[in-house]
Amino acid sequence: MTKSQDIIEITNHYGAPNYHPLPIVISEAEGVWVKDPEGNKYMDMLSAYSAVNQGHRHPKIIQALKEQADRVTLTSRAFHSDQLGPWYEKICKLAGKEMVLPMNTGAEAVETAIKAARRWAYDVKGVAKDQAEIIAMKGNFHGRTLAAVSLSSEAEYQRGYGPLLGGFKLVEFGDIEQIKSAITPNTAAVLLEPIQGEAGINIPEDGFLKQVRDVCTENNVLFIADEIQAGLGRSGKMFATDWDNVVPDMYILGKALGGGVFPISCVLADKEILEVFNAGSHGSTFGGNPLACAVSNAALDVLVDEKLAERSLELGEYFQSKLKEIDNPVIKEVRGKGLFIGVELNEAARPYCEQLKELGLLCKETHDTVIRFAPPLIISQEDLDWAIDKVKQVFSK
């Protein structure tokens, strides 16, 4: 038995079976490449669901981690830290928002945005007590917490977790008329992913996000953009809402905010929204901790200084063009923005992901029939050519 097999066996024996990973153990990583304990090398085309946009173990981010770990790692929010304020300023200026509320995981940030929207509806908009509604999209993925699965349209995500939370309405993603029809005087917010990741890299028609912005403004409804996966350069823009040149009332960020090194997430909005919170009304022991802020500060610098959004746009167009050249009836569609690409098949995608793994390329199926390609944004064109060669091999069989 190899070391990898032994580790997988131990993991399966002691771990709850809530994941179905490809049978590979990663023990080392750098840039776009990872290794298993046996020394086999693989290209990472998943980026930990877009958390590793800056590449594995980016030296500037690792240096920030080490330096901060030698100073102070956790203060709780009972005290100030010298990292929190400067990080607040940096992320607010990047997003063009007045305030930020830090958390740790994406799902926590979604919960925070929902709480903010509801309290805003009661305290600012004047919605009657416990009547606030939030409109979300079918096919959404906002996390695994109870609120997040309560607004999901996937029955399996909800099975056995009832009673679910109320106050959510679901409409078709991309259908502005359904959103208009769903709005009532009690509507607090419209919550959506500008590009639906887990649903199969679903991209709305050009102009849809602008329509959502306009409808929300007309009806005094908050527009909340969950940019956890599609944001921070992944789509070829700093924020995926930039594709329609719109600014939501709230950004939800996570994943690449920590540079693939440390978990950190946040909600960004203007004062009118986030000032609905008062001391003790929301919080997190680890949210905004010094280590996370130092790491995120470096991660944001890397995104901006290395122009990773622009790089994603250029290389994404190149990679998509090469994928579209593959002539195979199994391939139904190639779609994406930047280096956030889905190849939809006419059959199950996992067997193809397993074949690609054997050729040294790691990717993951999503929504059963879609192969998601989302490499670190630091990837080179030469590496993309290598990846294309492997994909062509699999689809030439």
UniProtKB/Swiss-Prot annotation:
GO terms for molecular function: identical protein binding; ornithine aminotransferase activity; pyridoxal phosphate binding. Keywords: Amino-acid biosynthesis, Aminotransferase, Cytoplasm, Proline biosynthesis, Pyridoxal phosphate, Transferase. It is an enzyme of class 2 (transferase). SUPFAM superfamilies: PLP-dependent transferases. Its cofactor is pyridoxal 5'-phosphate. One of its GO terms (biological process) is L-proline biosynthetic process. InterPro entries: Aminotrans_3 (IPR005814), Aminotrans_3_PPA_site (IPR049704), Class-III_PLP-dep_AT (IPR050103), Orn_aminotrans (IPR010164), Ornith_aminotrans_bact (IPR034757), PyrdxlP-dep_Trfase (IPR015424), PyrdxlP-dep_Trfase_major (IPR015421), PyrdxlP-dep_Trfase_small (IPR015422). It comes from the Bacteria. The modification N6-(pyridoxal phosphate)lysine is found at K255. Its main location: cytoplasm. Belongs to the class-III pyridoxal-phosphate-dependent aminotransferase family. OAT subfamily. Catalyzes the interconversion of ornithine to glutamate semialdehyde. This is Ornithine aminotransferase. The lineage of its organism: Bacteria, Bacillati, Bacillota, Bacilli, Bacillales. The gene is rocD.
